[in-house]
Amino acid sequence: MPRMALGLAYDGSSWQGWQTQPHRQTVQDTLEAALARFAGIDGSLPTVCAGRTDTGVHAAMQVVHLDTRLERRAESWVRGVNAFLPPSIAVQWAQPVPDDFHARFSARSRTYLYLLWRGRVRPPLWAGRAGWCFQPLDVQAMRQAASALLGEHDFSSFRSSQCQARHPVRTLHRLDIDERGPFLVFTLRANAFLHHMVRNLMGALLQIGQGRQPVAWMPAVLAARDRRLAAPTFAADGLYLSAIEYPPEYKLNDTDGSGQLLSPFTFA
């Protein structure tokens, strides 16, 4: 059966995560219902995503695949499915892909951004869309601590107790911290992420930025492989799934020919 890939963006503020759940409003359920209406069938069209996002987490570039015999032009998929979606979810592009393409398992890497507002007063115009820290932060100390996380490590200290991953080893390729006016933009790219890994890393970095822990605390916590020794999980508000990287042979809708699917909505 022919396979389609779709690129999505969504505001996660009003959704209880990506994954379908009984009696809950999720992005997956809403998308699959819209796909079924577009295809003119009862029920839903099952999808597989590149990365499941939690309650309150946003996506500037989520990728899904689905199998369907429906033949439409790419632009018809975009406009047609969006006609049945709420304003907080939108298909950005659609493209036929080979049968061996898998939105999750074909991905080489995922990139997340965390948008943090620095200010004495919470930012009402960014409510639900940016994290907030009212205390002064030592950005250089956070950058030094972040460097200890790069490479392949056992990230058990930064995984949720509900994490279902078969093993905790991940390769973190990038962890940048950029100052953009009142914002700090954290960019993290890895082959894959554990459940709550980004938010747990954020919590630890802020402990160091606020001077509550020294820079040397980060590699010690990483080496301990014990979630109890790390910082609390930080808020979901400012977290965005922002890019997915696939092998170039799939010729997806990337912006630079590298296979890295980027979004016009992010700060990257």
Swiss-Prot record:
Top-level enzyme category: isomerase
Residues given in the record as substrate binding sites: 112
Gene Ontology MF: a single term: RNA binding
SUPFAM superfamilies named among the record's database cross-references: Pseudouridine synthase (SSF55120)
Active site (catalytic residues): 54 (nucleophile)
NCBIfam families: hisT_truA
Quaternary context: Homodimer.
Name of protein: tRNA pseudouridine synthase A
Gene behind the chain: truA
